[in-house]
């Protein structure tokens, strides 16, 4: 193992320095990316993703706080067949979120520069390999089904109640619990027909460039309370709250992003949402500045009083 634990924004191995320990993180097909509608290539021949075994399953789902995120282990009876007929078996599902200030969103992929509140990743491996461990070393080994979360004045999303209520059982890094009877399909967007597709990488070290990404156009809706629970329940290895556990968007470098829809379905561009978007961007920028300054200032005493 590596002596130093990687992080997003603190210490020796923050995301700017990942490539020093994990060279692939400095590669040319990294994830996440900004999905720019004007550059996306429309490909109507991309068929809907075929999900099998994603519905209610009464078995056990181990859930772990791994110090970076909360991870749900998935049974290999869950699989996804993509448009070209490749079958991928599910391995685990995890989340990326913000929360370092009330307005900070934490999705990894952005759409036309807009960052969503949370991003959900369901990680799969190519069924032609015997295990995830084997597949993760292969060039066509992995696929991630990604979904973005919106929060407005939504009522509680009942499909997330059980999961969120058990976060307190895994407050500390390394803790695990077991959930019974989850419906993963219900935890995903209602409409899975439309998606963006591109070739990228894992968004955490070792950042291997063998991931076929499928980012669903439709979103998951959570209530503000649910989002705040996720943002404030878990502690990392330093016993600090896990927040802003997302990687910044990476250069596209001549890759092509395809989508099987023409424009973003039912996205209302109200003045309010535009304003929210700009405020959010300002907030993001301030947060990056804060991170940057925090690293440049010599550590006198523990700066616990930062905002």
UniProtKB/Swiss-Prot annotation:
Residues reported in the UniProt entry to bind Zn(2+): 94, 96, 121
UniProt function note: Reversible hydration of carbon dioxide. Its role in saliva is unknown.
Origin organism lineage: Eukaryota, Metazoa, Chordata, Craniata, Vertebrata
Chain positions recorded as substrate binding sites: 203-204
Molecular function terms, GO-annotated: carbonate dehydratase activity; zinc ion binding
Catalytic site: 68 (proton donor/acceptor)
Chain positions carrying an annotated carbohydrate: 50, 239
One GO location term (cellular component): extracellular space
Tissue expression from the record: Major constituent of saliva.
Keyword terms of this UniProt record: Disulfide bond, Glycoprotein, Lyase, Metal-binding, Secreted, Zinc
Family the entry assigns: Belongs to the alpha-carbonic anhydrase family.
Catalytic activity: hydrogencarbonate + H(+) = CO2 + H2O
Domain Alpha-carbonic anhydrase: start-end pairs: 4-261
EC number, UniProt record: 4.2.1.1
Name of the gene this protein is made from: CA6
Protein name listed in UniProt: Carbonic anhydrase 6
């Amino acid at each position: 193992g590596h002596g130093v634990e990687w992080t997003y924004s603190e210490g020796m191995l923050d995301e700017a320095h990942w490539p020093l320990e994990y060279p692939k993180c400095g590669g040319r097909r990294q994830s996440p990316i900004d999905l720019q509608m004007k550059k996306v290539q429309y490909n109507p021949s991309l068929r809907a993703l075929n999900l099998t075994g994603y519905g209610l399953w009464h078995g056990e789902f181990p859930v772990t706080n791994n110090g970076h995120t909360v991870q749900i282990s998935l049974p290999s009876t869950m699989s996804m067949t993509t448009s070209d007929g490749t079958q991928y078996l599910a391995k685990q599902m995890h989340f990326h979120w913000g929360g370092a200030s009330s307005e900070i969103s934490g999705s990894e992929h952005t759409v036309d520069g807009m960052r969503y509140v949370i991003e959900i990743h369901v990680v799969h491996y190519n069924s032609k390999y015997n295990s995830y461990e084997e597949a993760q070393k292969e060039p066509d080994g992995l696929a991630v089904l990604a979904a973005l979360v919106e929060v407005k004045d939504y009522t509680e999303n009942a499909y997330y109640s059980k999961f969120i209520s058990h976060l307190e059982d895994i407050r500390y890094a390394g803790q695990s619990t077991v959930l019974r009877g989850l419906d993963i399909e219900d935890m995903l967007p209602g409409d899975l027909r439309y998606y963006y597709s591109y070739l990228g990488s894992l968004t955490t070290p070792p950042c291997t460039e063998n991931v076929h990404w499928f980012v669903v156009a439709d979103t998951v809706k959570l209530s503000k309370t649910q989002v705040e629970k996720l943002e404030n329940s878990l502690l990392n290895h330093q016993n600090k709250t896990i927040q802003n556990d997302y990687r910044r968007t990476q250069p596209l470098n001549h890759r092509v992003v395809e989508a099987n829809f023409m424009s973003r379905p039912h996205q209302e561009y109200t003045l309010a949402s535009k304003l929210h978007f700009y405020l959010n961007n300002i907030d993001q920028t301030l947060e990056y500045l804060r991170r940057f300054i925090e690293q440049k200032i010599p550590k006198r005493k523990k700066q616990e009083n930062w905002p």
